[in-house]
C-alpha cells in the first residue's frame, strides 16, 4: 500500500487562533498529529501550512513541511498545491489528516488509504461512526452521512439524515437514542486520488456546498463517488474549542 499523508495546518483559526502551536503536554499540537501519522504505513508525512511560525516549528521537531499559498479557501485546495509541488502522478493517493486531530489512530489512516485502493470506482474515501445520542443527531456541527449498499456516499448533511418521520415529530429531548446504526457521523479524514484534487480546484463551489458549508458536496455534485465505511477504531473528536483543547490536554498528560 503506497500513499502519503498531508496535514493542512492553518494558524488563523476563528474559534481557536494559533491552535497548531497550542501546547499539549510539552509539545505543540501539530507535532502530536505528525507523530501519530508517522505511525501509519504512509511513505511520507508532510505538514502543509501558510504560516511561518508553523513552518519553523515543524522544522524544529524534525518534521517535513511545505509552505503553501495563504489564499486557499479549503484544505482540499491546499492538498492540490502540495501534490503539484511534489509532482505527484494523477493516480497517486494522498490521505488528508486534519491538523487538529492529535489523537488520530494510525489504523484509520491505513484504513482509508486501503479503502480507496480497493475500490477503483471511488475518487475519494472517508469514514464514519454511529451516532446514538439524540442531541448529537440534531447537532449541526456533527455532520451526518448516508450511503448506498456498495459503500458509496449518497449525501452529507448537517441536518438529521435519515429522517425518522414518526419519531422525529416530538421534541428532541423525547427522541429515543438511535441504536439501529443508520445514523452515521462523518469523520473528517479523507483519501484522495490526485486526479480528483486536480479536478476539484477547477470546479466552482456547488449550490449544495454553499448551503451546507461542506466541501465534499462539491465532489458528489460533480458526479464523482466517495467511498465511506465505518471506522475500524474509535476516533476521538478534534480540537475546535478551548474545551476540546482542555480535554485533549488532560488525556495526553495522563497517558
Swiss-Prot record:
The keyword Transferase applies. It is an enzyme of class 2 (transferase). Pathway: Nucleotide-sugar biosynthesis; CMP-3-deoxy-D-manno-octulosonate biosynthesis; CMP-3-deoxy-D-manno-octulosonate from 3-deoxy-D-manno-octulosonate and CTP: step 1/1; Bacterial outer membrane biogenesis; lipopolysaccharide biosynthesis. SUPFAM superfamilies: Nucleotide-diphospho-sugar transferases. Pfam families: CTP_transf_3 (PF02348). It is found in: Cytoplasm. The keyword Transcription does not apply. Keywords: Cytoplasm, Lipopolysaccharide biosynthesis, Nucleotidyltransferase, Transferase. GO terms for cellular component: cytosol. GO terms for molecular function: 3-deoxy-manno-octulosonate cytidylyltransferase activity. Its main location: cytoplasm. Its EC number is 2.7.7.38. GO terms for biological process: CMP-keto-3-deoxy-D-manno-octulosonic acid biosynthetic process; lipopolysaccharide biosynthetic process. It catalyses: 3-deoxy-alpha-D-manno-oct-2-ulosonate + CTP = CMP-3-deoxy-beta-D-manno-octulosonate + diphosphate. Activates KDO (a required 8-carbon sugar) for incorporation into bacterial lipopolysaccharide in Gram-negative bacteria. Belongs to the KdsB family. This is 3-deoxy-manno-octulosonate cytidylyltransferase.
